[in-house]
From Swiss-Prot:
Source species taxonomy: Bacteria, Pseudomonadati, Pseudomonadota, Gammaproteobacteria, Pseudomonadales
Any GO BP annotation: translation
Keyword Iron-sulfur set for record: no
Function noted in UniProt: Located at the top of the head of the 30S subunit, it contacts several helices of the 16S rRNA. In the 70S ribosome it contacts the 23S rRNA (bridge B1a) and protein L5 of the 50S subunit (bridge B1b), connecting the 2 subunits; these bridges are implicated in subunit movement. Contacts the tRNAs in the A and P-sites.
The species this protein was found in: Pseudomonas putida (strain ATCC 47054 / DSM 6125 / CFBP 8728 / NCIMB 11950 / KT2440)
Family to which the UniProt record says this protein belongs: Belongs to the universal ribosomal protein uS13 family.
Region annotation Disordered: where it falls in the sequence: 92-118
Assembly information from the UniProt record: Part of the 30S ribosomal subunit. Forms a loose heterodimer with protein S19. Forms two bridges to the 50S subunit in the 70S ribosome.
Presence of keyword Acetylation: no
Record keywords: Ribonucleoprotein, Ribosomal protein, RNA-binding, rRNA-binding, tRNA-binding
Protein name stated in the entry: Small ribosomal subunit protein uS13
SUPFAM superfamilies reported for this sequence: S13-like H2TH domain (SSF46946)
PANTHER family noted in UniProt: 30S RIBOSOMAL PROTEIN S13/40S RIBOSOMAL PROTEIN S18, SMALL RIBOSOMAL SUBUNIT PROTEIN US13M
Annotated S-S bridges: none
GO cellular component, one term: small ribosomal subunit
């Protein structure tokens, strides 16, 4: 198994699919990485040379991925909560942030139903 950006990449999958195992790298980004590195996207990771894997590592390093990306996202949410803006309050209360209805639905964000006290 190759290790790129601190993630074990599966050997038996195509390069594009394998790169999506990295948090912050989707299909489009993976295709761009392969194109910039000059690697065939349909080639399997086990068939790539060490030199090609090194170029992939270099290309992935240009993007914000894994822990840095998670930290960035959490810091942005924390900033909204500290500002006290509407979006921050919704994050703090655990409700939908982007204007969805909450009278019905929104169960994923609100969590399981709580019994009504009498």
């Amino acid at each position: 198994m190759a290790r790129i950006a601190g993630v074990n990449i599966p050997d038996n999958k195509h390069t594009v699919i394998s790169l999506t195992y990295i948090y912050g790298v989707g299909r489009t980004t993976a295709q761009k990485i392969c194109a910039d590195a000059g690697v065939n996207p349909a080639a399997k990771i086990k068939d790539l040379s060490d030199e090609q894997i090194e170029t992939l590592r270099g290309e992935v390093a240009k993007f914000t991925t894994e822990g840095d990306l998670r930290r960035d996202i959490n810091m942005k949410i924390k900033r909204l909560m500290d500002l006290g803006c509407y979006r921050g309050l919704r994050h703090r209360k655990g409700l939908p942030v982007r204007g969805q209805r909450t009278k019905t639905n929104a169960r994923t964000r609100k969590g399981p139903r709580k019994p009504i006290r009498k």
